[in-house]
Amino acid sequence: MEKLYVEGNKILNGHVIISGSKNAALPILFMTILTEGKIKIGNIPNLTDINIALKLLVYLGVKITGNETLCIDASSINIFCPPYNLINKIRASIWMLGPLLARFGKAKIFLPGGCKIGSRPIDLHLNGLTQLGATINLKNNCIDAYVKGRLQGKYILMEKISVGATITIMSAATLAKGSTIIDNAACEPEIVDIAKFLNTLGADIIGAGSNKICIKGVLKLTGGTHQVIPDRIETGTFLVAAAASQGHITCHKTEPKHLTNVLMKLTEAGAKIKTGKDWIKLDMRGKRPKSLNICTAPYPGFPTDMQAQFALLNSISKGIGTITETIFENRFIYTSELIRMGAKIKIKNNTIICYGIPKLISSNVFSSDLRASATLILAGCIAAGITIVNHTYHLVRGYESFPKKLNKIGANIKII
C-alpha cells in the first residue's frame, strides 16, 4: 500500500472493532523464545511488523501455526543470529536479545530498524543486560552477547523511563538466578500484559504497571494460553476520527481504562464520552472541537503515539492549542504536510502551536511514519476535496485494515 486516494468532506459515524495491540503482541511473540512449552496466543493483529516477527521466529527454528490465534512451539530453536534483511525492518527485533540470552546464553543481533523518529538509542537495553551479567560487544552494527551460566538477578535503576528497555530487562530476568528489581520502570498497559503472559508460563513477576517491578528468577518456563489486550492507540485514533469530523462512533473490544488521559482530553474538546466494560462511545455531532493544550508523557500521561492525531484535531478546533513532545525527538515531521492542507502550525523547540481554522483543504501529502500516515488519512477525510496520501506503506505496520474500517464508518478511501 503505497498511495491512497481520500475523498474529503466526510462525517465519520458508526461502529469499529478494535484489533489486538501491536505494542503488546510484538514483544509477547518474542517472549515465546524463553520456553520449550507449547503456547497459544489470541487476538494477534494482522500487521506487517507482526508478519516480520513471525518470519524471524521461524528462521530461528520456532514452529508456528494459525492466524489471529497462533500456536507456537519454540522447543527446536537452533539458530541464534537472525538475518539482517529481517532485523532491519522492525525495531521490535531488539526484544529477541533478552530471551535468547536468558535461555541459551548467547545471541547475535544486528541493530534493528523501524520508524525513524529522532534518537531511539538501545543503550538502556544493553546496560540492563550487562548489569544482569551479560557480556556485550557492539561492532559493525551488530550486538554480540553471551553469558556464562545463568544471568544474575540485580537491582537496576533505569536512568530514564523506557518501555522497550523495561521489556528487555523483565524478559531476561525471568530465567535469571535470584531476584531482579527494575526501578523507574515503564508502567504502560502493554508492560502489564507482557508480565501477565510470562506469569502464565510460570514466571514470578509482581509490580508490573507500577514504577517498580520485581522478578524472581525461575529455572524454566512452561506452556500456556494468552489473549493480547486491545490496541489503545488504534482506539484513540478512531475516536479522534469521529471528533475531528463532528461525527459519532462506538469502539468495540477495547479497554477504556487504558485511555483515561485521551478520553479526558476529548471530553475537554467538547465530546460526549460514554464507556462500558469493553466499549467507548464518542459523540461530537454538530460541534466544532475546542483547542487543547497537551504534553506527552510516559503512561499514565498522554501517549506520544497520539500526539499527531491530536495535532490534526487542534488544527480544525476553535482557538489556539499546543502540543509539547517530551518522549521522542523529530516527531513533528508530519506538520509540514498538515500545513500543505492549510493548517496554521508553528514549531517552537519541542512544542507545536496550532491556530485552529474551520476547514482544511485537499493536497498531495507524504507520510513520514506510522502515526503520521493515519493522521494524514484522517485529515484527507475531513478536508475539502480529494487528498492523495503517499508513502502509506507505514500504515500496515501498525493499523489492521485501517482504510477498510474507515470506509465502514463513512470514509471513501481507495488504494491507488
From Swiss-Prot:
Zinc recorded as keyword: no
GO terms for biological process, alphabetical: cell division; cell wall organization; peptidoglycan biosynthetic process; regulation of cell shape; UDP-N-acetylgalactosamine biosynthetic process
GO molecular function, one term: UDP-N-acetylglucosamine 1-carboxyvinyltransferase activity
Residues at which UDP-N-acetyl-alpha-D-glucosamine binds: 91, 120-124, 305, 327
List of catalytic residues: 115
Keyword annotations of the record: Cell cycle, Cell division, Cell shape, Cell wall biogenesis/degradation, Cytoplasm, Peptidoglycan synthesis, Pyruvate, Transferase
Listed Pfam families: EPSP_synthase (PF00275)
Enzyme class (EC, first level): transferase
UniProt keyword Metal-binding, yes or no: no
Cell location: Cytoplasm
Catalyzed chemical reaction(s): phosphoenolpyruvate + UDP-N-acetyl-alpha-D-glucosamine = UDP-N-acetyl-3-O-(1-carboxyvinyl)-alpha-D-glucosamine + phosphate
Any single Gene Ontology cellular-component annotation: cytoplasm
Stated family: Belongs to the EPSP synthase family. MurA subfamily.
Listed HAMAP family: MurA
Listed name of the protein: UDP-N-acetylglucosamine 1-carboxyvinyltransferase
Provenance organism: Buchnera aphidicola subsp. Acyrthosiphon pisum (strain APS) (Acyrthosiphon pisum symbiotic bacterium)
